[in-house]
Amino acid sequence: MKKIAIMQPTYLPWLGYFALMESVDIFVFLDSVQFSKRSWQQRNMIKTHSGPIWLTIPVMTKGKRDQLIRGVNIDYSRKFPKNHIDILVQSYQKSPFFNEYADEIIKIMEQKKTSLSSLTIDLILLFRNLLNINTPISYSTELSPNGVKDEMLASLCYQLDANEYISPIGAKEYLDDSKFFRELNIGIKYFEYNHPKYNQINGEFAPYMSIVDLLFNAGKDSLSILRQGLKSE
């Protein structure tokens, strides 16, 4: 049984993103679909001294409609990435493992990559390495799948010889009746994640923060903590 997950690249993803990645035999970045403004594709949450806040990457959207994720460019005229780096430093510099990981994260953010997906994917790959996750990676842009939505997902599974698609539970409503998966004899299982608790600075525990929150607070224990939330059906 070859398990596959197919996910859009997101900015500083939460724990569940990496738990899903570690649960499969191959992980595909779905970077060939339409960009959704102010979605996880360009933002996520971290925990500051005053509580959780959004960090959102500014992007070029004026006069550009129906952009694919891979075609969206970052708007560097709006103080990014300095504003995000400053907030990360102010929020986490006193965390136990900040000094262990911060330089590598900041180095990627300061590279001023042109496209949104180049930055978000490079950060995700860094976090994958820091967590010691070894799942092979592929990209939908390199595979040219057929169709849209469930047809595209089934096509990606087929091209990569996967026979079990592990999907976020939120897609259950439209995947349950997918003829494309049935026709290709590809099974579907739904991934659920019970968010674990861990020692966290800046007050009362707040779940669903970016993976940086776990790394800065838990260090080498991050992967074992990540696994505590695993639950699939």
Residue ranges and their predicted role:
Residues 1-233:
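Residues lining hydrophobic/aromatic ligand-binding pockets adjacent to catalytic sites
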